[in-house]
Each structure stands twice: as C-alpha cells, then as structure tokens.
Amino acid sequence: MKDLLDIMRKKTDSDGHAPVEFDRIRIGLASPEMIKSWSHGEVKKPETINYRTFKPERDGLFCAKIFGPVKDYECLCGKYKRMKYKGVICEKCGVEVTTAKVRRERMGHIELASPVAHIWFLKSLPSRIGLLLDMTLRDIERVLYFESYVVTDPGMTPFEKYQLLNDEEYFTALEEHGDEFVAKMGAEAVQDLLKDIDLEAEISRLREEIPQTTSETKLKKASKRLKLMEAFKDSNNKPEWMVMNVLPVLPPDLRPLVPLEGGRFATSDLNDLYRRVINRNNRLKRLLDLAAPDIIVRNEKRMLQESVDALLDNGRRGRAITGSNKRPLKSLADMIKGKQGRFRQNLLGKRVDYSGRSVITVGPTLRLHQCGLPKKMALELFKPFIFAKLQASGQATTIKAAKKMVERETPEVWDVLASVIRQHPVMLNRAPTLHRLGLQAFEPILIEGKAIRLHPLVCAAFNADFDGDQMAVHVPLTLEAQLEARALMMSTNNILSPANGEPIIVPSQDVVLGLYYITRDAVNAKGEGMVFADTHEVNRALATGQVAIHARVKVRVHQTVINENGEREQQTIIVDTTPGRCLLWEVVPEGLSFDMINLEMTKKNISKLINSCYRKLGLKDTVIFADQLMYLGFRQATRSGVSVGMEDMLIPPTKHTIIDKAETEVREIEQQFEQGFVTAGERYNKVVDIWARTNDQVAKAMMDNLSYTLVKNKQGEDEKQKSFNSIYMMSDSGARGSAAQIRQLAGMRGLMAKPDGSIIETPIKANFREGLTVLQYFISTHGARKGLADTALKTANSGYLTRRLVDVAQDLVITEPDCGTRGGLVMTPFIQGGDVIEPLRDRVLGRVTAEDVRRASDDEVVLPRGTLIDEKIAAQLEEAGVDEVKVRSVIACESTFGVCAKCYGRDLARGHLVNPGESVGVMAAQSIGEPGTQLTMRTFHVGGAASRTSAANSVQVRNKGTVRFHNVKTVQHAKGHLVSVSRSGEIGIADELGRERERYKLPYGASILLKDGELVEAGGIVATWDPHTHPLVTEVAGKARFSQIADGVTATSKTDDATGMTTVEILPVTARPASGKDLRPAIVLDTTDGGEQFYFLPQNTIVTVRDGETIGVGDVIGRVPQESSRTRDITGGLPRVADLFEARKPKEHAILAEVSGIVSFGKETKGKNRLVITPDDGSEIYEELIPKWRQINVFEGEHVNRGETISDGPQNPHDILRLKGEVALTNYIVNEVQDVYRLQGVKINDKHIEVIVRQMLRKVDIIDGGDTSFIKGEQVDYIRVVQENQAVLAQNKFPAKFERQLMGITKASLSTDSFISAASFQETTRVLTEAAVTGKEDDLRGLKENVVVGRLIPAGTGLAYHLERRRQEAEAAEHALHNDFSEVDQAFSQALNSEQF
C-alpha cells in the first residue's frame, strides 16, 4: 500500500523526492514486518475525536501523533506554528510539524492479540487456504470459528495431522495421551499448519503424483494445488501471511469524520468497523492478562475474527454488520469494487474541470468545423486565458484586477474573449458516448442566448436531435491537447464512420427532401424542351419564372473529370437535365462528372456522391461540398412546401378485393382443419402465411397507386410519371418514413404480435386513415407496449455488451507494420437466395491480399500478394471475374502484442492503411456496440407489426446460368425428377464467367427439376417443396412394413368422416402409455434384394403409406408438421449477438459427427439412442448417446464426414472450433453477427468482428506438455505456446500439443495477463485475491492499466512515449552490460601484465 503511494508520487513532491520511474506493478501478500514498516504508530484506542474540542484523541483512530498534524505546519497543542519549525517533533504533544496532507498517506497499525485469517484467502473461491492445506472450507471454518480442534502435530499418537476433533474427543485424547500431541483451534492453528508446509517437498511430491493419477477429479485438484504452491514459491509469498498478526490502519483522511451542524458527525463506515476491531482486540488483551476462562477467551477471539472479516469484506461470511440505520456498512472491499468503487468511479472515469453543459439547438448557418458557444459559457470556460491576456496586454495590472473586470463584464473583456477563442478548438460530447464520434472538436463561434448550436450534419455521429438533448463542452488546455483536438478530433477530419468506412456526414431529413425535390423531373412542366447555353442562363430563367424547376431541358455543361492517369481534363457536353439539377451542379466541386448528379437525389445517391467526392478529391473539397449541399437542401426544402395531409394517404381501390380473396382462402383452410386434413399447427401456419402474403399484396397495390400518377404530356397523351405526393416523396427520398410505415397509414396494418412474440392470426385489416375499431386498437397496443418495455431494458443490455467488448479488446493496438504471416481468410461474395447480399468487392475492400490472386479462366496473376485493395482494384477484380480472394486477417496475425498493420488493412475512418498505434480493439468494440444500442432504442417504430415473410416453397432463379449443386445428395424418383436427401445442400447459379450469382438452401425432401450443370433460364424453377412439413423420403424401393406402430400405444389413427381416409399419427413420447415409452415406431422397407432399411419415425409424424404398400425410390412415407415461426425483432438480435460473443452453448444444439465414417445404431438405453460411427481410418469406434426426442438426420449405413450435422439445431461454436478449425469458426461468428445487424440494415465491417474473435481465441489448452515448461491441462496464451514450440523445435525436442480454446468475452477479459485490467472489469475480489497469492506482475501493456496508474496510454500519440521509454531502458541495460565487459577486460589485461612468465 505504502509502496504504491511512493510509486504514484508525481514529479513535484512536497518532500522533494524524485518521482519513481516504474515499468510494472507487482501485487503480493504483506508480511507483518512490512505492515509495521508502513506504519507510523500503533492505534490503541477506539476513540476518534474529542466531541468538545474537536481535536483528535491521542492513540485513537485520528491521532495526530501517528498520522500527522490536522493543520498545515502546526502541532496539536499549538506550541510550534509556521514553516520555520518544519520537521520538528513537539515534545509536549508528540506531533511532527509538517503539511496536513500527510494524513492522507501515513498509515497506522493494530497489533492483534490473536492471529486472524484474511477472509479473502479463506472465502474467495477456490479457497486458497483450503487448497494449500488440502482441507475443505467447511472444516477450516469450524477450526477458525472455534467449533473444533485440529491436530497440528500428532507426535506418536494414532491421530493424523489435519484431523478435526470436537471438544469431547479432544479432552478424551488429552487424558489418554497427555501432551504427546498438539491440537489447537482458531486462526493460530491454521497459521501453524500453514507455517509447517514445506513447499519444495510438496511440489516435488505432487509432480511425481500427477502422471500416475487416473481419476480426473484427483488430477484436477492436484494440478491446482501444484500451480498454487509453485506460485507461492516463485512469488516469495509465505503461506502463513494469509493469516494476519498485524492489521494496517488506513490513513484518517481517506476515512474522514466531518462535523455536521447541530453537533452531529458524518463518518465513513470504516471508522465504525475499525472501532469494533479495536474494542474487541483490547478486551481480548485484558481477558488474556486476567487469564480468563477458556470459553470466554475463545468467544472473544471468534468475535475478533468476525470483526476483522467485516472490516475487510462485510457480508462475505454470515450476516453483514449493519449501522444505526439498518444499512450494511461499507467495508474496504466494497470501496474498490462495483460501478461506484475506486476503479470504475475514480480511476477509469474522472470528472473534468474546464467543462460546461447546455441544451443544443440547430445551427444551420454554421460551417462543418464550427459550433455556436454561448458567450456566458465561453467567458467562464476560458477564464484563465482571459486573465492572462488582460495582464499581458496591460489592461489589468494583477490577476485580481483581471478577475474584477471579468466579473463586471466590461466591453474590453468581450474583445479579449473573441481573440482568445480564435483558433482554440473546444470538444463537444453527447452522452451516451457509444463510439469515438460521440466526442468531436469544433471551433467555437460566440453567440447570444444560452444554448449550444450544433451543425446539423454531425447529428448522425452524435445521434443527437433537438428535442431537448444536452451536450457537454470541454476545453483542451495544453498546446499538445489543442493540436490533437485539431488534427485528430476536428469534425472535418471525421467524415467516415469507423464502423464501415462509409461517410457519416450525410445529409438527412429536410436536406435530403430539398435536394430530392429539386432534382425530380416532371412531364410537361413550364419551359420543357428549352435549351440553355450554361447553368447561369438556367438560373436567370428560373429567377424570372420562364422555366419550372422540374422541367426537362437541355443545358451545355462544362465539367472537369479525372481520367485513368489521375490527370484532370476539361469537357463540354450537352445534357438532358432539369433546372433544379443545374442548381445542384453549381455547388459540386470540380473533378466530379455531371452524370453523378443527373439523377434523383435520394439519400443513397447523396451518400454515394459524398463518398466518391472524398475518394477522388480528398477531404477539403468534401467538407466544403457537404456544407454547400446542406445550405442548398434547407433552402429548397423550405421552398418546396412539402407537407402531410389526409388526402396524401391514398388507399388503393383494389384493397377490398384482395382482402376478400384472402378471407375466402382462410375459410377453406378452416374447413380442411375441421375435416382433419391439416393439423392445428399447420392451419395456424397457413393462415398466418396467407395474411402475410395479403399484406404484401395490399402494400404493393398501395405503393403502385401512390408512386405514379397519369399526366398529359406535350402531345396530349397520357404518360405515367412519379408522383409528387408529399408522403411518397418523403419516403422515396429516404428523408423520413418507410414503406412499412406508409403501409400502416394507407394500406392495412397487418399482423400483430402478442407480447410473447407469437403472431395473432387475425390481422388488422384497417389502416390509420380509415381508423381502427376498439378491438383492433387493443390488439395493436400489445406491440406498442412491448416496444417501450424493450427499449428500457435493451438500452442497459446493449451498454453492458459494449462494456464487455471494450474490455476484451482494449489492449489490441497496431504494433508493427507486417508480421509476415501467410495465413488469412478466403473471401467470397455473400449470397443468400437470389440476392448477392454483399458482393466480393465490398468484402475485400480495404484488405491486404495474403497470396497472389489469379484469374479463374487462365490462371494469370491479377494481384500480387501483399497489395492493399482499394476501390479501383476491387472494381478490377470484379471485371477479371475473380470469385474468391484470400486476404490477410487479424485472426491469422502473428504479432506478439497487438496486431500488425498488414493483417488489419485499411483504417476505415481514414481511408488509408492503418497507422501504428491505432487502437483497433476499442474501435472494433465501439463499432459493434454502438448500433446495438441504436437498434434496441428503435424497436417500437413499426408498432409491433409482425414483419413475417411468407414461407418459401420453391427455388426460382433470377438470372440465366448453370445449375451448381453444393454437397447435395439426391435419389432418382420413378417419375424422373431428383429428390434431395441431404440436409445442408445448396443450389448455386453461375453466370457465363463461372461466377456465382445466386445461392439457395435446399431443404431435405425437395424435388429437384434440373440436373447438376444444366442451363436454366431467368425465372426458371429449379426445385419445389412443401414449406410447412418435413418429409421422410425413401432412398431405396421395397415393401413397407410397420414396426412397433400400435394404435393407442405409439400412434393414433384418425378417420375422416367426409372422405373415409385414415391417417396414422405417431404420438409424442410424453403422450404415450407406459408400455409405449421405450418403443421406437418405424417403417421397415423390405428391399427387392432381400435387405431391410429402417426409417424411424419422429414424434408427431403423419404416416402417408399403408402397411404392406409397395414404395418407390424418393417416395414420401411420412411428414412431420413444422411448428410456427416467431417474429424476428432485434430483441432476438441483441441477446443473440451477446450469446455469440459469450460463446454460449445453445440449448439443444446441433450434434456434429466427431469423426468421418459409417453410421450405425447400437443398443438403446432408456430415453436415448446410441449412435455409432465406424471411422474410415480404422481408429477406435466413436459412440454417442442422443436423446430419443432429437430427430436424427442420418440413416443406418450412411457415410458422414467429420463436422457434418447429425441432428439439426443451432450450431455450437465450440464444436465448430474443435471439428472444423478457427477459420470456420470465424466465418460462423462473423456471418451470424452480420445476419442480426443486416436484418436491421446496419453495416459493420467484418474486420471488427474478427478482432473480437481473435481475443476470444487467445488461450489454448495444453494436451501434452512435451519438452516445454507447460503442464497438461494448463491454459496458456496461444502466441506464447507457438513461440515456445518454435524454440523447442529448434533444439530438436518435442513441442507441446494443444487445443485452441474458445472463451466468451467476459471470461476472456478476466483471463487477461493484466490484473489491474481484470480487477477493474468484474469480480474485483476474486481477481485481486488470485493476483496477490501468485504475486502477479502487471506489465502495463494495455490501455486500461495505464489509465489507472495515470499515464499516457500506449496507443495513438501516447505510443511514441512508451516506445521511447522502452528504447532508453534497453540502451541503459546494454550500456551496463558493456561496462561490465570492459571491466572484465581490464582485469584480464592487468592480470596478464602482472604475471611474470
């Protein structure tokens, strides 16, 4: 404690000490001697201060003699006052004359009358004392709290060491053996036992024992003990120090006692806890002096132990000690842990001076790098600068005079303020700061009023709106801080989003609407067909009203474009355009072509425009352009006069016919259900499906009706043109509102979800314009309420996810240019169904190639290895028809600390290769966490309307191409078509270049109409299936024979009265009578060649064949109805992302084949099937027990590959890692996380997810230590193992064998090397206990640790400082070594010279 204090002393120390330079911090156990060396005296009395004089009592908890004077340079009795007596110790009161702040650092101690065990090492699991002594926690507690004796030295008696005796047994033994043996109780006994441990001997014994143990539990326990003992041995901690004889006392100013008015005192809880300890300790001393009866002394010792426990960690054992107001007292442990504890409240987050906050309003006239700062605030924030300036300019003689002037607000003060503020950036921050763009620098402009003015374009980055949001202003004081604020944090330098590299400074809402409005064209507007010489002429015509803003005209345009070689060339062209687009052209910078703006400026197009402006023309032009766009957009939106009226919500005339048709269909299904053709689940599914489809049809009719109007053109004919309906324009431009919202206004509200997520099958057929009935309104309140409740809960969850992500990735920084690895990920376009969701160019953009990229057709190298792929190269790759590229990835990076620039690739927020020192870990965490919060805050906007697509029932291709099968197994049906019998099959469609354009999942039992490699036209149907049932398909022909299908036992048969048809349905195991519980209903096919094939029927199967019927290949013998699907909302999303990053095993996860081989089924056990795989390579047979209710996808005799799915379900990431490797795991996690975000339309670069996955894969499990220093079963850093293995292999020894370990982010954060980082994250007590016992050293490599010790962080501009320090140390070490050598040389030469040969 005291040592830490010495370390933390800063340069200007009161006692003139030089600051201690340190590289690492070690934590350990304090010996009694050490505690005494910290102390300035013993606290003997429980008194605090005298209630009359308010002076501290002597030898009490606030004693001035021990802890130092209460007032600066003044002893307690007042004999010595002032500086001149500094260092004098008053002979009357014994107080040293010095500053009062020593009361914050001087410690005291309490000599305990009997030893006391430290509760952390006793109760924090696993109990360290218990592990060392190999006793159970229960037993140790019984000894400690004086319930039983423990034998510490058995002597020649039959007792064993560590044996427990109760009172009776002890007294009997005493009579029998006298003092031949020693048994004690209490902490003394434990201390003696700990002292007796011979670590060396125990370690060697355990090392011999471990290889011989066979039992798993014994092995685990032994290796745990071995680790702990080696830690004690290596760290120079002694086990007996876990029991304390001396208790340190915290300096009094850290546990203050403050007098309140009315003679009461407010005190820190620690004082109460210390008082308790001192009282009991003094009483115990007295009792021992009086030689009181044993039972009384014992009770007192127990109470002392309890009071020390409460002081260290109240509530850890038994009931927490409460104060006067029934509130548990806050102990030392509570002071450091939790959100309000020392770490998170004071070390990682501090309050900042020179800051203010106010409400924000919009500042449409500002430039992008400016913000409006109220004069009042500026005056307060820049006070010291103003004082200095007033003094320097001679307007004020002293600081005091300057202060007066500022208070009076004289006119010259405002002039000074204006000059001080010029070029001095301030930082604006909006809470919650979810990513780094939540804190940006601006140049302040002084304004009247009291609200901060914010530039509208940065609102997206801050996620700010002007409905009462507040923002904080911070002033960077030092020159370096101002420089960094300007160069790195200025809003103009943060145009791209770090999450996806797209512009984040993109106009929205009014601006988009304005730009969209002026760039629309209209048929037969005034002035159509006119020709203009240039844009100025267009302007004049517009101003005089000769031409309408939407008219189609011809204009001669001068444009400057940048050609292939990067040179600018002038062009003059005549274009068909509108006057509005010419207005826009006037603000477009030189270098962009006219065709980029000669279209309707929707939000997407504007974003593209700004993006290409940034890529082609650089930062400065883009910033100016963005501002001009904004001014133009606001102006034109005002002039457009777009507003919303009831008349704008056009209800499609065909709505009622569509709904009537749907109602007929629903009635038909109801009839089928009544006749027993469909099950209740199927009926529900089909009804919901019909309504989902109807909703889409109404929406489509509505959009068609809304989006086009018929107008007469110049020739007087009818022509369709896009509508100028206000609501449609808002939605079409991307300014506000979506098709889904308009659908609720003018189409039908559609299906609603219940609070549990299931869909109510009666939809709301009305829309908001028609109005809802009471019932409809009531149904829709479900969704709305769920939305609000979700929002409240999810915001907290999302914040917590971000915190965990930041914590796991905080120490990942770019540390070197290139690690030289050849590994990486193979990138392919991401195709789902008929859509290329993410083309290859987007996936490889900003990555570095890991190996030469070759053209598929002629194997020519298109791109050499190690190239950074930019937009131009990405486009070339597409043209060359490249289908996959292997790129470098952080997953494969081999840097020891952090990652290398080549593996990371482009810094998304800056658009070039990432700089050294960039903290990519935190960036990744923020990029993933930030949208999480956004999404959770936005759940309720669709009003809980169930967005469920109608189920797919066929593969219909969109492009002409060749059919490709991807691991599809098929059988040929008698009718000629193929039937799919594979589970994970996919069908791809490749174009003429061989690039895949579409990809579809193929369910089991689908009928495939084309063969592999056949041509298919656009719109052709390749496969069909029934989406609501899961068929059982035969793979051989033969005669069906029912096995164990007994009516009323394992099955039930229903006869339909209307048709006389009988169907057999298999009962679920739970619904069967006892006799049918263990039966396995199956259909056995007696094949033509005399064999038999078993088809086991899962529960609820509806059998579609009769006993004895002849069956062909590919026939359906039964179908299993599929259950309904729930609505997917980001509510499913956020917990899903958390589950993925926590690497949780899903419930009922997919079962994968552990080895490749032939499947067979062994003897069943109760409730489980035994699956046997006979491996191809002849190794031992693999068996697995699978619960009977699981549907098994493979049949007897089928061949499976390692990692293939045996039983469907959600994938278990641990299985993927074990069976398919880390690349497959990375792809799985990246795709799954991306699915959740993609569903919400959020773009995140894959890189960020990979960064987190790298951190989750940090550790490995050692399977066999080989010749390395690792023990079997140990968890070690992957990089460490790889390095040690290389070293061992170089000496021709055996390397360690290991298995990569996947850890959830919480666990990974806690298993970091830095104990400071782990302790400040979660489970502070556990982390610190473990670190202290093992004597851990923190090398202060991460960001968090350095923030805690108050240093620059080793990232960004702080990295240089750390590298320089390391360099100097290395130099000093080398220098010392060099000196040693020269001394040796000298000695040698002297010796040689003096020798007389």
Swiss-Prot record:
- Residues involved in Mg(2+) binding: 465, 467, 469
> Which keywords annotate this record?
DNA-directed RNA polymerase, Magnesium, Metal-binding, Nucleotidyltransferase, Transcription, Transferase, Zinc
The catalytic activity of this protein is classed by the Enzyme Commission as 2.7.7.6
EC top class, as a word: transferase
SMART domains in UniProt:
RPOLA_N
Biological processes annotated in GO: DNA-templated transcription
Binding residue positions for Zn(2+) 2:
819, 893, 900, 903
Question: For this protein, what is any one GO molecular function term?
Answer: zinc ion binding
Reaction(s) catalysed by this chain's protein? RNA(n) + a ribonucleoside 5'-triphosphate = RNA(n+1) + diphosphate
Q: Which Pfam families match?
A: RNA_pol_Rpb1_1 (PF04997), RNA_pol_Rpb1_2 (PF00623), RNA_pol_Rpb1_3 (PF04983), RNA_pol_Rpb1_4 (PF05000), RNA_pol_Rpb1_5 (PF04998)
Cofactor, how bound (note) = Binds 1 Mg(2+) ion per subunit.
- Any idea which positions bind Zn(2+) 1? 75, 77, 90, 93
GO CC entries: DNA-directed RNA polymerase complex
The cofactor named in the record is: Mg(2+); Zn(2+)
Q: Which residues form the signal peptide?
A: none
Instruction: Indicate the family of this protein.
Output: Belongs to the RNA polymerase beta' chain family.
Describe the function of this protein: DNA-dependent RNA polymerase catalyzes the transcription of DNA into RNA using the four ribonucleoside triphosphates as substrates.
Oligomeric and partner information: The RNAP catalytic core consists of 2 alpha, 1 beta, 1 beta' and 1 omega subunit. When a sigma factor is associated with the core the holoenzyme is formed, which can initiate transcription.
Instruction: Supply the name of the protein.
Output: DNA-directed RNA polymerase subunit beta'
Its source organism is Acinetobacter baumannii (strain SDF)
